[in-house]
Amino acid sequence: IRRQRQMCIRDRYQKKTVRKMILKDHKRPDGRAIDQIRPLAAEVDLIPRVHGSAMFTRGQTQICDVVTLAPLSEVQKIDGLDENVTTKRYMHQYNFPSYSVGETKPSRGPGRREIGHGALAERALLPVLPSVEEFPYAIRAVSETFESNGSTSMASTCASCMSLMAAGVPIKKMVAGISCGLVTGETDDDYLVLTDIQGLEDFFGDMDFKVTGTHDGITAIQMDIKIHGLTRPIVEEAIARTREARVYIMDEVMSKAIAEPRKEVNQWAPKIEQITIDPNKIGDVVGQKGKTINEIIARTGVKIDITDDGAVSVCGTDKEAIAKAIDMIKIITTDFKEGQIFTGTVVSIKEFGAFIEFAPGKEGMVHISKIAKERIEHVEDVLTLGDVVKVVCLGKDKMGRISFSIKDVPADQK
């Protein structure tokens, strides 16, 4: 008990002394001026194999952020109170391991700090993210706290912004974040606003005012105060101070690491192409019990997502495979016209002709009289199962089946 009392007395004296030095003498614990930012450093592409990575350091606070891109089918499913919000396309996760503050303890599930800081950094970037039409990806950013001495959420905002740009996400503008503190005296006019507070100033101070934004405006604000309220001059000064600090961070540090988003996504990231089809043709692409779409996936190795309005996203790491899958989908959804030329495979031979599969789940028939220029007695004399042939569309017969001809294919198309 005696030791606890001694600690309480020491903490009260320390708090009183620190606040007095800041308020009266304008001396901060680390010797900085009231509007001075701690030493900064920024770097991108730390981890070579990930889709995007960045490191942001502010004094004794250091964050490493990693961005992962995925097709839209990988968006986070939300089961919350708002029935209108069922998915989340951009996810920012913040981790605060014990070693970042020199401690050792079990690493359990996310706590209030992890959830709150992650949500703040996530909201900070939402206004500048591209639309789904511009960038059809699900985006996940993970911020790992390597070292912590105040404002890790603001460092996470800076690191995740650079990581997104390094990953090739076409964000509209660069975003940075900074935190301001406050020490108050006996009267409303007796106060001092501090730029870029560290842990001790946060602990002994009266406010933690976090602001994120671009050169042109604010994207997110979070304020924690230990007093009953703030006057208008305090708020105005804090906002002005954070803007000045944000601009400095972006111009002098972040822009020198990466000035603008990469033109293309990382070579290891999945490539996504989008096309739009007639919603009435979705059933043709999917096929009975998914047979057609699964056949396309098996042949090309891509991933295909289709929405109810006919938007088709094809995702894969090989551009040629993506193009091949899109060609198959276009063939399946095409209203066949006389004279169109296709490449197909002989999948069935009958006495009267052969069936040619020219797209997954799509077949047409070549009558025996349309196989060769000369008369043939048996289809097998010219064709065998598995042969790849060029065919020209003759339209549809009375039963609605597609009719092909091999012999009428123009010579320059063979």
Predicted regions mapped to residue ranges:
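Structured alpha-helical segments in the cores of large, soluble enzyme domains
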Residues: 88-94, 98, 117-132, 164, ...
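Mobile "lid/hinge" segments at catalytic clefts and subdomain interfaces of large enzymes
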Residues: 164-263
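Glycine-rich, flexible beta-strand/loop modules in the N-terminal catalytic cores of phosphate-handling
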Residues: 46, 51-137, 217-227, 231-236
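Flexible hinge/switch segments at interdomain interfaces of large molecular machines
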Residues: 93-100, 132-136, 212-217, 228, ...
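Conserved phosphate/anionic-ligand binding catalytic regions in large, soluble enzymes, centered on
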Residues: 44-67, 149-170, 283-293
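Flexible, glycine/charged-enriched surface loops at secondary-structure junctions
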Residues: 6, 23-34, 103, 128-138, ...
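Single conserved hydrophobic/aromatic residue that forms the stacking wall/gate
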Residues: 1-9
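Single-stranded RNA-binding regions, centering on S1/OB-family and related RNA-binding modules
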Residues: 268-272, 279-414
